[in-house]
């Protein structure tokens, strides 16, 4: 890939947009303030968890007593689900069950992975940032997600890419705007037949039959200049 992808995310609390490196520390300032303001109130433990796949990321806040299945379902809905494939969490030194609690799995300095589809596998990595005592009711809150990446057309290099060729993608940067996609059809019969897939904000992009998530659709689209 000859493009430099810029990854940034919007803060759930103040909607400020910050870089991938900055957003985590920024969210922490809000969470610390919320925890301090909740002293003396009814609270419960939450884990701030970072999910990453290269330039794509999610910051989520999860009830520490919830089961791992809640994260599996969330990842399927926002990033992964296409054909009902199997999935699992894992770590090189221990096994992780969907019935384990968040607090049992996410301890400091431990990074785990989540695999979706054992054929054409999409793997993401997860780690805990910090835990907080917060006055919330929701079992899971999306704190931030990377904005659509600045994927530009490989042919004209002027317009945002709206589709990709899943066949040519393994050999070249095969992302195209609407007009240049018509030109690619002339040289790639597979593209016209089945390999034309949409650009989406997910590490599952271009794999199997994935066409986008079922939640947070506003940030699942094409980059806008």
Each model region followed by its residue ranges:
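Short linear regulatory motifs enriched in tryptophan with gly/pro/ser
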Residues: 1-225
């Amino acid at each position: 890939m000859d493009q430099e992808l810029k990854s940034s995310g919007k803060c759930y609390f103040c909607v400020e947009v910050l870089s991938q490196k900055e957003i985590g520390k920024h969210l922490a300032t809000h969470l610390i303030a919320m925890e301090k303001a909740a002293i003396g109130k009814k609270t419960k433990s939450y884990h701030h968890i970072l999910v990453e796949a290269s330039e794509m990321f999610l910051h989520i806040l999860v009830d520490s007593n919830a089961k791992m299945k809640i994260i599996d379902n969330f990842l399927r809905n926002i990033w992964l689900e296409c054909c009902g494939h199997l999935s699992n969490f894992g770590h090189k030194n221990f096994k992780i069950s969907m019935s384990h609690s968040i607090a049992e799995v996410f301890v400091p300095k431990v990074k785990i992975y989540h695999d979706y589809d054992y054929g054409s596998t999409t793997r993401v990595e997860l780690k805990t940032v910090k835990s907080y005592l917060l006055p919330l009711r929701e079992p899971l809150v999306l704190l931030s997600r990377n904005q659509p990446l600045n994927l530009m057309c490989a042919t004209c290099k002027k317009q945002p890419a709206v589709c990709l060729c899943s066949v040519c993608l393994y050999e070249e940067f095969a992302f195209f705007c609407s007009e240049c996609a018509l030109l690619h059809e002339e040289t790639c019969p597979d593209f016209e037949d089945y390999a034309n897939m949409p650009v989406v904000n997910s590490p599952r992009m271009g794999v199997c039959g994935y066409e986008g998530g079922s939640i947070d659709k506003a940030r699942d689209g094409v980059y806008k200049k």
